[in-house]
A protein has these predicted regions:
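Conserved phosphate/pyrophosphate-binding and hydrolysis machinery centered on Walker-type P-loop NTPases
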Residues: 34, 38, 108, 112, ...
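Right-hand nucleic-acid polymerase module
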Residues: 2, 78-79, 83, 87, ...
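Active-site-proximal segment of RNA-dependent polymerases
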Residues: 3-7, 90-152
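Glycine-/proline-rich flexible loop or hinge segments
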Residues: 23-35, 65-76, 103-105
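Conserved pre-motif C helix in the palm subdomain of viral-like polymerases
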Residues: 72-103, 183-210
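Conserved polymerase palm-domain catalytic core
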Residues: 51, 120-221, 225-244, 260
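Non-catalytic, polymerase-adjacent accessory regions of viral genome-replication enzymes
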Residues: 1-46
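Reverse-transcriptase-like RNA-dependent polymerase core
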Residues: 17, 48-71, 84, 167-179
Length: 349
């Protein structure tokens, strides 16, 4: 068996497809289509394997619709069967090849990484910077305007072609071309597109670390931060990075991309990181997040009181937010929120 055949087997044989089904059902087993597939999981997986081996597999037409909250965006929804196949393709062929060579501080959508790891990494960067320069220093915070809606298909496919073997690239290209019309724009809900998202800027990551020599650099998808002692040098970096992005068809969000003093604090992944005069890093939850949560809790509790939603679901929602808030220095805030949440239920048996 050659390498290409081995890669294909790792994607289309029964066991990886079955494992993908178990992964895909999480959080959506309540849907009728998912429950039906899962209840007949062995039979459906054998059928899918047979179609993939014989070359008779054809993806079903995706359903496209718009959502408006928290912001308007297009959604592409695919059948559960197609999701199972794509999950196996992503996990067993695309991701292992694409992630080779990533810098350590590319933090999104990867095994062993994520938001918690990214926050801890930024905190460590600030502490290291403090040991050399105190609180003197500057931040270049970058944000790309409409990262996924403006991602050119040829740019993403070129990156896939550069790093994937021939069989995997052919399958990847087929999936993306069948799901997305036109030359520009992807739906970030797709795992395959998320892999494109962490990969397309890989060359830029290496450029910032190895050519611009920025030691304290971190990227979470299209949100990235550079820390340096020189404001002038960071402004130079901004110009050079902007030119690199333009080559790929991207542009900065000019309102969110700026150079500023480290003393102002860095807002990243839902928290503001404040470096104190003693070198301690404090994480403060964004006030907007707290305000939104209070409104949401009020709405959910009213629904529960009317019998439209079980209290356990509302408790689960609040505890999820609370666990997130607890990642910062939020002891007093959590006490206030616990009291607010308890007061919302007053009058209930």
């Amino acid at each position: 068996m050659n390498d290409a055949e081995e890669i294909a087997e790792n994607v289309i044989e029964f066991e990886p497809l079955l494992n993908s089904m178990y992964k895909c059902k999480k959080g959506v087993i309540w849907k009728d289509s998912v429950a039906h597939y899962y209840l007949n999981g062995i039979e459906e997986t054998l059928k899918l394997e047979k179609q993939l081996r014989e070359g008779t597999y054809k993806a079903r037409k995706p359903v496209c619709f718009k959502v408006t909250h928290p912001k308007e965006r297009d959604i592409v929804s695919i059948s559960f069967r197609d999701r199972v196949y794509q999950r196996s393709l992503n996990d067993n062929a695309i991701y292992p090849q694409m992630s080779k060579g990533f810098i350590y501080d590319n933090m999104a959508c990867q095994k062993g990484k994520g938001t918690d790891k990214a926050r801890n990494r930024l905190k460590a960067f600030l502490q290291k910077h403090y040991r050399k320069h105190g609180t003197d220093g500057y931040v270049l915070q970058c944000d790309i305007s409409g990262y996924y809606p403006n991602m050119k298909h040829e740019v993403a496919l070129e990156k896939f072609k550069k790093k994937l073997d021939g069989w995997t690239y052919e399958k990847t290209e087929t999936v993306l071309n069948e799901q997305y019309d036109g030359d520009t724009g992807y739906n970030p809900g797709s795992q395959m597109v998320q892999i494109a998202g962490i990969s397309v800027l890989d060359e830029l990551d290496h450029y910032i670390k190895e050519v611009l020599r920025i030691k304290y650099y971190i990227r979470y998808m299209d949100d990235f931060i550079l820390i340096h002692e020189s404001e002038e040098y960071l402004n130079t970096c901004r110009e050079k990075i902007e030119a690199k992005l333009q080559d790929k068809g991207f542009a900065f969000n000019q309102k969110k991309t700026k150079v500023y003093s480290l003393r102002k604090g860095i807002t990243f992944l839902g928290f503001t990181f404040k470096l104190t005069d003693t070198g301690k890093v404090i994480l403060i939850l964004k006030p907007k997040n707290v305000k939104q949560e209070r409104k949401k809790l009020y709405r959910l509790v009213q629904q529960a009181k009317r019998g439209e939603k079980p209290k356990a679901k509302v408790d689960e929602c609040y505890n999820g937010w609370r666990n997130h808030a607890a990642k910062g220095n939020s002891t007093k805030l959590l006490r206030r929120m616990d009291k607010y949440y308890k007061d919302l239920w007053k009058g209930e048996a």
